[in-house]
Amino acid sequence: MSFEIRATITSDNPYIYETYRFFEELKIPYTLAFAYPSDNTSNQTLTTYSNESIERVRCSMAKLLLDYKDTLKKGEKIYNNVLTSQFSLFEYRMIRERICSGGVNYYTVLADGSIFKCAHLMNNKADIIGNIYDDNFHFGANLAIAPNINELEEKCQRCWAKHICSGGCPAQKLSLSRKAEQSLPEANCGIEKILSEFYLKVYTLFKQTRQCGN
């Protein structure tokens, strides 16, 4: 059975690089995400990104890039699932129709049968889209949480990272009182660009080491 570990990095975390290294050394597939505002408003400082915290992300990714360079040269496995999924997109020049399949072929179901488009929305009863015990509910309905990439606003359409971040997480936008078609706030968008550049650089290293026979 396939599985992965998921964890969230808060904006005040001074050990971003070390967090990635910890999960790589576990040698278990994992996904890390940067925290964003939610219904828990008591810790908003953990989801607010300053210029300093954004620069910390940039420096951590630069340091991690050197580690992955060594990993690839040695022919060792990378356990970062976000990276490996991006590799597939780059390798086959695939363009995602939307960033997330929530409400299309992915749903969250609670013990009482309540259905949500996304696990991030399950704290709000207003986001219940049906119940598995309701015979009238049809999964084939157009319930996608994420818009088609061509429906994103003009700022996203002109961005070089459009086909990598695909506009960003729609649940994150909803938590920020934005529409799914809108762009993320500047700080969050900046982090997405740092990560997109990082994915491209690691993929370039991956291709170079393969061509060298490693």
Explain the meaning of each model-derived region.
Residues 99-100, 108, 149, 158:
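Generic structural signal for beta-strand residues in well-ordered domains
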